[in-house]
Amino acid sequence: MWGLEVLLLLPMASFALYPEEILDTQWDLWKKTYRKQYNSKVDELSRRLIWEKNLKHISIHNLEASLGVHTYELAMNHLGDMTSEEVVQKMTGLKVPPSHSRSNDTLYIPDWESRAPDSVDYRKKGYVTPVKNQGQCGSCWAFSSVGALEGQLKKKTGKLLNLSPQNLVDCVSENDGCGGGYMTNAFQYVQKNRGIDSEDAYPYVGQDESCMYNPTGKAAKCRGYREIPEGNEKALKRAVARVGPISVAIDASLTSFQFYSKGVYYDENCNSDNLNHAVLAVGYGIQKGNKHWIIKNSWGENWGNKGYILMARNKNNACGIANLASFPKM
């Protein structure tokens, strides 16, 4: 046991022994890699202290992972100078309506008779567009919604097109644009509006603008939506297998999520009652004995595993992944 304790202290000791030589070089390299600039020396110092704290967390976690404590690894990325609280505040955006309740009219009834395949990956089927970056705009709900619509468009027409999250940010009056929103509100908008523009017709700018929807740029329509029974991962698995990519909501508030790199993500501190981020389930499978969901995020390809994360499946609805799952009808 003493050996483990000594090992766990090694990363902390290395930071204490080489505060200037090692950290200065790594800090400069990180700033150059991600083109970071700061308004003042004071601002840079405060950001560096956050970065150092995150780097220590990553180092210790990965040591524990090498000893079998965790099923996933972390890595420094472009969010290195942000706290987890700042990430949630600036880069998530899920807002569930206070009056939200499921109705029988929109409830998805799975086909329990036929067996779902052991694994599915819609990236390999051509249902998934490239990873996008929402930037510091609380528009995760728009990217999640667009991803589900893109999958259904591919399924129906055979064509994969980038649809416009900015169209949703600007035009879904029931949501709050970069201030946050909810996926079923987006699906309802597309249904009532009789369409959503393509990304080419209505490009993403990452801030709230006036609604500029143009029917000539319309690329997809929607006939409504269905919601997965709350907290039911088996129903979610059936939906992913039978329907396509599904919009889901998760708790993305932990530092472990912020710096996820590879492996199957499971953090017992992830709170299924604290849903703050919308993402897209594009498949599921198993890696080294660990069942997982394949999740597409909207924080760019520099985050996670080229923009994706494998999240634990069938582990008591980890991170609340099956609590607010839905998809559009097309």
Curated annotation (Swiss-Prot):
<dbReference type="GO" id="GO:0006590">
    <property type="term" value="P:thyroid hormone generation"/>
</dbReference>
<dbReference type="GO" id="GO:0061037">
    <property type="term" value="P:negative regulation of cartilage development"/>
</dbReference>
<keyword id="KW-0325">Glycoprotein</keyword>
<feature type="propeptide" description="Activation peptide">
    <location>
        <begin position="17"/>
        <end position="115"/>
    </location>
</feature>
<keyword id="KW-0964">Secreted</keyword>
<dbReference type="Pfam" id="PF00112">
    <property type="entry name" value="Peptidase_C1"/>
</dbReference>
<keyword id="KW-0732">Signal</keyword>
<dbReference type="GO" id="GO:0034751">
    <property type="term" value="C:aryl hydrocarbon receptor complex"/>
</dbReference>
<dbReference type="GO" id="GO:0005764">
    <property type="term" value="C:lysosome"/>
</dbReference>
<dbReference type="InterPro" id="IPR013128">
    <property type="entry name" value="Peptidase_C1A"/>
</dbReference>
<dbReference type="InterPro" id="IPR039417">
    <property type="entry name" value="Peptidase_C1A_papain-like"/>
</dbReference>
<dbReference type="InterPro" id="IPR000169">
    <property type="entry name" value="Pept_cys_AS"/>
</dbReference>
<comment type="similarity">
    <text>Belongs to the peptidase C1 family.</text>
</comment>
<feature type="active site">
    <location>
        <position position="297"/>
    </location>
</feature>
<dbReference type="Pfam" id="PF08246">
    <property type="entry name" value="Inhibitor_I29"/>
</dbReference>
<dbReference type="GO" id="GO:0016324">
    <property type="term" value="C:apical plasma membrane"/>
</dbReference>
<dbReference type="GO" id="GO:0001968">
    <property type="term" value="F:fibronectin binding"/>
</dbReference>
<dbReference type="InterPro" id="IPR025661">
    <property type="entry name" value="Pept_asp_AS"/>
</dbReference>
<dbReference type="GO" id="GO:0005518">
    <property type="term" value="F:collagen binding"/>
</dbReference>
<feature type="disulfide bond">
    <location>
        <begin position="137"/>
        <end position="178"/>
    </location>
</feature>
<keyword id="KW-1015">Disulfide bond</keyword>
<keyword id="KW-0865">Zymogen</keyword>
<dbReference type="GO" id="GO:0009897">
    <property type="term" value="C:external side of plasma membrane"/>
</dbReference>
<dbReference type="GO" id="GO:0051603">
    <property type="term" value="P:proteolysis involved in protein catabolic process"/>
</dbReference>
<keyword id="KW-0378">Hydrolase</keyword>
<dbReference type="InterPro" id="IPR000668">
    <property type="entry name" value="Peptidase_C1A_C"/>
</dbReference>
<dbReference type="GO" id="GO:0000981">
    <property type="term" value="F:DNA-binding transcription factor activity, RNA polymerase II-specific"/>
</dbReference>
<keyword id="KW-0788">Thiol protease</keyword>
<dbReference type="GO" id="GO:0030574">
    <property type="term" value="P:collagen catabolic process"/>
</dbReference>
<feature type="glycosylation site" description="N-linked (GlcNAc...) asparagine">
    <location>
        <position position="104"/>
    </location>
</feature>
<keyword id="KW-0458">Lysosome</keyword>
<comment type="function">
    <text>Thiol protease involved in osteoclastic bone resorption and may participate partially in the disorder of bone remodeling. Displays potent endoprotease activity against fibrinogen at acid pH. May play an important role in extracellular matrix degradation. Involved in the release of thyroid hormone thyroxine (T4) by limited proteolysis of TG/thyroglobulin in the thyroid follicle lumen.</text>
</comment>
<dbReference type="GO" id="GO:0045453">
    <property type="term" value="P:bone resorption"/>
</dbReference>
<dbReference type="GO" id="GO:0000978">
    <property type="term" value="F:RNA polymerase II cis-regulatory region sequence-specific DNA binding"/>
</dbReference>
<feature type="active site">
    <location>
        <position position="140"/>
    </location>
</feature>
<feature type="disulfide bond">
    <location>
        <begin position="270"/>
        <end position="319"/>
    </location>
</feature>
<feature type="disulfide bond">
    <location>
        <begin position="171"/>
        <end position="211"/>
    </location>
</feature>
<keyword id="KW-1003">Cell membrane</keyword>
<dbReference type="GO" id="GO:0005634">
    <property type="term" value="C:nucleus"/>
</dbReference>
<dbReference type="GO" id="GO:0005615">
    <property type="term" value="C:extracellular space"/>
</dbReference>
<dbReference type="InterPro" id="IPR013201">
    <property type="entry name" value="Prot_inhib_I29"/>
</dbReference>
<protein>
    <recommendedName>
        <fullName>Cathepsin K</fullName>
        <ecNumber>3.4.22.38</ecNumber>
    </recommendedName>
</protein>
